[in-house]
Amino acid sequence: MTASLWEFSLELYGRPGVQSACLSLQEDMGMDVNILLYCCWRGPMETEELEALMTKLGPWQRGVVSGLRTVRQLIKPMIKDLSEHSEVVAQLRKKIAGLELEAEKLQQSIMMHFAAGYATN
């Protein structure tokens, strides 16, 4: 675990096929991609650690990250439907995508602190 989780995630996510696989797991199975990336970064761990992490992050992931993602996805078809305002709607969607990314980055920061604390227990 030498690289930060964020750096590790960017490198792994950029590999061929990883992004599409992660997004498929997210869309089809409801997988939290950050949890998946954490598991790859962290390596072997006890079930209790993963359960504790999911319990800690569940409200943030469901309420904030997924909430922003849902809003971003809802706006996408509206860009065409609101053609007279399509540029403004597209800009708003882009801002929400940026907030979603920041929320994921914060989630990963929490995960890194969690891993550091768990490793010392």
Language-model-detected regions and their locations in the chain:
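N-terminal interaction modules that seed assembly of large macromolecular complexes
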Residues: S20-G58
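An acidic intrinsically disordered interaction segment
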Residues: M1-R15, S66-Q73
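Hydrophobic residues within well-ordered, non-membrane alpha-helices that form the packing/core
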Residues: R42, R72-I75, A115
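Helix-adjacent hinge/juxtasegments
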Residues: L57-H85
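A charged, amphipathic interaction segment
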Residues: P77-N121
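A general alpha-helix detector
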Residues: F8, A21, L37, L53, ...
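Short amphipathic alpha-helical segments and their helix-coil junctions
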Residues: L5-E27, Q91
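A structural signal for well-ordered alpha-helices, especially hydrophobic packing surfaces
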Residues: Q19, Q61, V65-L68, R72, ...
